């Protein structure tokens, strides 16, 4: 046929059997990739430290999606929360991966069968004897089946009625676990951070899908609508399907980047806005203040801060700090976190407590500035020492650590104080192992960043694909250059004057 590469899909345009075949093969490729990728990630994943080296620090991409749906155990004898298990059951990480690969193989065989046996009776229009598809009826079938799946997921899997539930955590990502979720039918169900909304929305959307599917199965479209929307053209199906996919991609890019109950920070890492707003820092200070109110010492109050909470309050876990084209996991960037050194408290020689200004997200370098409780600059690390007024040496800044590995340790040596002031710009201070993975010290993004970038990019491409194919199907006659009156115009004797539709002959 000699088709150019960008037109090869025309071979299935009027061939329902092989159109079905290539879609089954596509499903085989997707399921095969998912299963294979899961096995690869399981081969390189280290489950030993879920607090300082969680899945998102290691660059895991498919493991978080399995986990949020209720998979927590491995045939390797470990649990995602750090415990050991003896009976992981069939639906472990490996079990799910294996199921995808088996399903992929079955789809592969089915695709070959449908490619060979393409000329089936079911695809033939009995009136014309030619291959054709009843697209409105197929739309109704798909809508009904997807509605059943959607309803079933919300009513059974998420609620734990027949299934494990989903991953649910607290607002600070500390106590996450898989548990059943009750549907939220009130206004709170519209809060994107309320897990109950996942159950109720799936139940509601599934019910709507079932009813809409039954409607489209029992009611034929009006002729004008059928012709106006080109419902008999397979390219209409392609166009509207692309629209559904790009819309979904835009939505999930938003829920991933801005955060929601469907994208827990324990599985995908924190969002950039949690750093920008000092979200974890405020919670840490609230807990310390509560401890001091209970007559705890500063050291005791800081020692009770969970290491997990302190680790979230570190700029290296901000997905917007890694460049989009820096390959590798977060661990390949700043290293594997080993331990929290503690919270540094800086004071000048007058005993006034100073706070290091934190680095904003989109800065690579930032001046080291220490301010007091009123926001007045009291110390800095100057660019030009000759003009300095607030240098660490001049102001006499010291640092003391509370909580963590350096609890109770203080330093007055200016070089050491400046070192910790620079590190305090980046949030809580952690000891990082760069040797194991030969980490280069350049921040990387988390799976949250990759997912958002990928889905936003493809959504944009698919948006243009929708416009393209929608235009092609709506204006097919214009693009093809076929005028509906063309037959009459060139028919001998149709007009008194050849090609002039105003002189049409009247039949006697």
UniProtKB/Swiss-Prot annotation:
Membrane topology category: Multi-pass membrane protein
Molecular function as annotated in GO: chlorophyll binding; electron transporter, transferring electrons within the cyclic electron transport pathway of photosynthesis activity
Entry's transmembrane regions: 21-36, 101-115, 140-156, 203-218, 237-252, 457-472
GO cellular component, one term: chloroplast thylakoid membrane
Biological process per Gene Ontology, one example term: photosynthetic electron transport in photosystem II
Subcellular location: Plastid, Chloroplast thylakoid membrane
UniProt similarity note: Belongs to the PsbB/PsbC family. PsbB subfamily.
Chief location: plastid
Cofactor, free-text remark: Binds multiple chlorophylls. PSII binds additional chlorophylls, carotenoids and specific lipids.
InterPro entries: PS_antenna-like (IPR000932), PS_II_antenna-like_sf (IPR036001), PSII_PsbB (IPR017486)
Complex formation: PSII is composed of 1 copy each of membrane proteins PsbA, PsbB, PsbC, PsbD, PsbE, PsbF, PsbH, PsbI, PsbJ, PsbK, PsbL, PsbM, PsbT, PsbX, PsbY, PsbZ, Psb30/Ycf12, at least 3 peripheral proteins of the oxygen-evolving complex and a large number of cofactors. It forms dimeric complexes.
Xref: Pfam families: PSII
Keywords: Chlorophyll, Chloroplast, Chromophore, Membrane, Photosynthesis, Photosystem II, Plastid, Thylakoid, Transmembrane, Transmembrane helix
Its biological purpose: One of the components of the core complex of photosystem II (PSII). It binds chlorophyll and helps catalyze the primary light-induced photochemical processes of PSII. PSII is a light-driven water:plastoquinone oxidoreductase, using light energy to abstract electrons from H(2)O, generating O(2) and a proton gradient subsequently used for ATP formation.
Lineage: Eukaryota, Viridiplantae, Streptophyta, Embryophyta, Tracheophyta
Protein name per UniProt: Photosystem II CP47 reaction center protein
Provenance organism: Lepidium virginicum
NCBIfam families linked to this entry: PS_II_CP47 (TIGR03039)
């Amino acid at each position: 046929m000699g088709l150019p590469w960008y037109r090869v899909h025309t071979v299935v345009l009027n061939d329902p059997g092989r159109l079905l075949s290539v879609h089954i093969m596509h499903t085989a490729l997707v399921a095969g990739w998912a299963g294979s990728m899961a096995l690869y990630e399981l081969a390189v994943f280290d489950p030993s430290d879920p607090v300082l080296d969680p899945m998102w620090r290691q660059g895991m991409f498919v493991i978080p999606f399995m986990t949020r749906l209720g998979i927590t155990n491995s045939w390797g004898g470990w649990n995602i929360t750090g415990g050991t298990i003896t009976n992981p059951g069939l639906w472990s990480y490996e079990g799910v991966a294996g199921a995808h690969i088996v399903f992929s193989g079955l789809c592969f065989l089915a695709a070959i069968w449908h490619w060979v046996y393409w000329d089936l009776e079911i695809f033939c229009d009995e009136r014309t004897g030619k291959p054709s598809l009843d697209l409105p009826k197929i739309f109704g079938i798909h809508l009904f089946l997807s509605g059943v799946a959607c309803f079933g997921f919300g009513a059974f899997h998420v609620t734990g009625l027949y299934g494990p539930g989903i991953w649910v955590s607290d607002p600070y990502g500390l106590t996450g676990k898989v548990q059943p979720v009750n549907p939220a039918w009130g206004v709170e169900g519209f809060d994107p951070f309320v897990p109950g909304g996942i159950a109720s929305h799936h139940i509601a959307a599934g019910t709507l899908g079932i009813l809409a599917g039954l409607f489209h199965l029992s009611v034929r479209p009006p002729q004008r609508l059928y012709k106006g929307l080109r419902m008999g053209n397979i390219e209409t199906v392609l166009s509207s399907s692309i629209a559904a996919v790009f819309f979904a991609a835009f939505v999930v890019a938003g829920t991933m980047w801005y955060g929601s109950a469907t994208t827990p920070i324990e599985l995908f890492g924190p969002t950039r806005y949690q750093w920008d707003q000092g979200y974890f820092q405020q919670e840490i200070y609230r807990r310390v203040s509560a401890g001091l109110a209970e007559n705890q010492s500063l050291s005791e109050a800081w020692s009770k801060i969970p290491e997990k909470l302190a680790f979230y309050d570190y700029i290296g876990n901000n997905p917007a700090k890694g460049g989009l084209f820096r390959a590798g996991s977060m661990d390949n960037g700043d290293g594997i976190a080993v331990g929290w050194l503690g919270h540094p408290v800086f004071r000048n020689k007058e005993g006034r407590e100073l706070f290091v200004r934190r680095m904003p997200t989109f800065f690579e370098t930032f001046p080291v500035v220490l301010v007091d409780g009123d926001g007045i600059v009291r110390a800095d690390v100057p660019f030009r020492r000759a003009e300095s007024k607030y240098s660490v040496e001049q102001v006499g800044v010291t640092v003391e650590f509370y909580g963590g590995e350096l609890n109770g340790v203080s330093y007055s040596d200016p070089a050491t104080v400046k070192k910790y002031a620079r590190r305090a710009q980046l949030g809580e201070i952690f000891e990082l192992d760069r040797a194991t993975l030969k980490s280069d010290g350049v921040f990387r993004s988390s799976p949250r960043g990759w997912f958002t970038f990928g889905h936003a990019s493809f959504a944009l491409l698919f948006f243009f694909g929708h416009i393209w194919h929608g235009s092609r199907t709506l204006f097919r006659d214009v693009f093809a250059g076929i005028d509906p009156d063309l037959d009459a115009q060139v028919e001998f004797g149709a007009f008194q004057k050849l090609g002039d539709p105003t002189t049409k002959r009247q039949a006697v």
